[in-house]
């Protein structure tokens, strides 16, 4: 098949993956309005076309936390990444490393920290949740530091798991889930051979290393459900600072006041994010939340953004709305599931080309020249105020 965009990878991934895995990453919370709004709102951000600007010396390079990035993109933490391709975290990290951008390893990765870190040249980032088991958190931080991880991404929008109705229908959860997953795997031989048989062990590597025993999918669901901590507060972040002296990014900010709190706390960065629409349906899309947050804290803290980004044009839009860098989640996972490391590498090349086109036609020679001035104001920052119901279609 012809691959020219992330949407092509999504279609290919749907054919390759058992339904329980495809819908786990593709779906969102409740009726998935926020999931779809993430994409729809971002698509409504209109850019000013500028011409005759001599764009021959255009550059996408940027700096974040004293790291040089070839473009303002990093791969987001994604749980169970190693179930989408054989040792998926290793393959995705290699593609990001070759492109000169950061890879973020999830707490609930299949491949443990110690397997991924030695395979790449640049330091990877590590993502952590606040969990009841503080011993695990401390252990994970110590291991991340020992492995040379440079930046901690601290996810704060999961004090409790979101209600994801698709999971019950697809076999990730619900009645007879294990049997349904087995038969789905049988019906998807490419995945069954590449990942099901040759991608073992299917442990949650970071958790298994701490518990001293294998942890499979059922353990993943049960352990996390029992360990998410609804008592999370800024005091927990103070505790984390005792064990982590590198850059610390707070992921899951949607309100300007929370962004100001992150500045007061002394965080190095925030991620404007609604967890890809997977936590609470009906909240603002990241594109709609970002401008007010940028107005509140731009210049005081690094602003990253995710949710709804599917191409290089979307990256430029997010930066114009106020982000310094973006995180890619679903987009790279579709590519990984389709073609492994090569798929992710190709996706990143596509995004780079799309960014160059968008910057050339908006007159921005560098990332620093992308700003609110790049927007058509009536159609840029002023996005629709209401979360009106949308037709249920392609949520990619």
UniProtKB/Swiss-Prot annotation:
Keyword Oxidoreductase attached: yes
Membrane topology: Peripheral membrane protein
Subcellular location: Cell inner membrane
Catalytic class of the enzyme: oxidoreductase
GO molecular function: FMN binding; L-lactate dehydrogenase activity
Catalysed reactions, as listed in the record: (S)-lactate + A = pyruvate + AH2
Summary of the function given for this chain in its UniProt record: Catalyzes the conversion of L-lactate to pyruvate. Is coupled to the respiratory chain.
Entry protein name: L-lactate dehydrogenase
Species the sequence originates in: Salmonella heidelberg (strain SL476)
Lineage: Bacteria, Pseudomonadati, Pseudomonadota, Gammaproteobacteria, Enterobacterales
Chain's gene name: lldD
